[in-house]
Amino acid sequence: MQQASPTAIARILDANLNRAREGLRTVEEWCRFALENRELAEECKQLRQALAPWHQDDLRAARDTPNDVGTQLTHAQEALRTDVRALLQANLCRVEEALRVLEEYGKLRDPAMGACCKQLRYRVYALESGLLGSKLVQRLQQCSLYLVTSPQENLLATVEAALQGGLKLVQYRDKDAEDQLRWQRAKDLRELCRQYEALFLVNDRVDLALAVDADGVHLGQQDLPIAVARQLLGPDKIIGRSTTNPEEMAKAIAEGADYIGVGPVYATPTKAGKKPAGLEYVQYAVTNSPVPWFAIGGIDGENLGEVMEAGATQVAIVRAIMETTNPTQATAQLLTQLSRINP
């Protein structure tokens, strides 16, 4: 293997810094002048500014555009932009690819550069979701409380009571029922959620989500790859993924999860035998997840405060609603607690 010269590394870094910053500026102009979205425009600007210190004079000096063989390489798709969405998608992909190159080759120059570009890449994933994400995903981002159901005879009544308490996000979870029963319950829950303008997701089963026209699906670590689920569900449905550690989080984000579950925070019978990830993982998610995430696992009204203190703003609940005698009141109280950080 030929040893790469410092000049070659410098040229790679220079080209990809240019590529990333140009792509971000293209996206920023749309956010600023067309959408007039201050938050998205500011994020683009901050990303550009975070890259600027790494674009040092020696990298610029290594540039050799006249002799760069890549300047003559073109693809027919480069000249085609069917609409603004396609333009934005192309530039965001360009930025993500450039940041990956900077992450890898930057390590050869300065490990801190590689680490910085890795975090910036995750932020671009979040920017892409906020800019191009479906209306369903945008609604999910506004949900602070997420009910994951458990099997019971009065399932519909319990869920409706929670919806009456202000709940806006429900996941139907039943690992053991026969498919005919699961389909009927999922269909009934979907209709109920629509009456209350709440989102409805199905646990694990992409086929069931499709059969009842759910708003999306939540996948475990052993379920279908996100890319396969996306191909089946289409671009607008919500796809979530359970994660229990930083490695699973990074993989889910890279694969395109719209949101992730972070936990189990505490021991819970719904994850029997699973060691709790603890509040440490919640704290990790605060600074490392660019996509929406819900703390999950053994959370109730008594320990919600410390989960919030660890940085969680969105939580998923099972027993604290499903097993209470007054789901409406329990839901309202949980939402009141969460409203202290989600005014």
Swiss-Prot record:
Swiss-Prot/TrEMBL catalytic activity: 2-[(2R,5Z)-2-carboxy-4-methylthiazol-5(2H)-ylidene]ethyl phosphate + 4-amino-2-methyl-5-(diphosphooxymethyl)pyrimidine + 2 H(+) = thiamine phosphate + CO2 + diphosphate; 2-(2-carboxy-4-methylthiazol-5-yl)ethyl phosphate + 4-amino-2-methyl-5-(diphosphooxymethyl)pyrimidine + 2 H(+) = thiamine phosphate + CO2 + diphosphate; 4-methyl-5-(2-phosphooxyethyl)-thiazole + 4-amino-2-methyl-5-(diphosphooxymethyl)pyrimidine + H(+) = thiamine phosphate + diphosphate
Binding note for cofactor: Binds 1 Mg(2+) ion per subunit.
Family listed: Belongs to the thiamine-phosphate synthase family.
Function: Condenses 4-methyl-5-(beta-hydroxyethyl)thiazole monophosphate (THZ-P) and 2-methyl-4-amino-5-hydroxymethyl pyrimidine pyrophosphate (HMP-PP) to form thiamine monophosphate (TMP).
Assigned keywords, A-Z: Magnesium, Metal-binding, Thiamine biosynthesis, Transferase
Superkingdom, taxonomy of origin: Bacteria
The keyword Metal-binding belongs to this UniProt entry's keyword annotation: yes
Name of the protein described by the UniProt record: Thiamine-phosphate synthase
Chain positions recorded as Mg(2+) binding sites: 204, 223
Any one GO CC term of the record: cytosol
Region feature Unknown, mapped onto this chain: 1-123
Gene Ontology biological process terms in this record: thiamine biosynthetic process; thiamine diphosphate biosynthetic process
Binding site for 2-[(2R,5Z)-2-carboxy-4-methylthiazol-5(2H)-ylidene]ethyl phosphate: 268-270, 298
Record carries keyword Transcription regulation: no
Thiamine-phosphate synthase, as annotated region: 124-343
Known pathway: Cofactor biosynthesis; thiamine diphosphate biosynthesis; thiamine phosphate from 4-amino-2-methyl-5-diphosphomethylpyrimidine and 4-methyl-5-(2-phosphoethyl)-thiazole: step 1/1
Necessary cofactors: Mg(2+)
E.C. code: 2.5.1.3
One function term, GO molecular function aspect: phosphomethylpyrimidine kinase activity
Binding site for 4-amino-2-methyl-5-(diphosphooxymethyl)pyrimidine: 171-175, 203, 242, 271
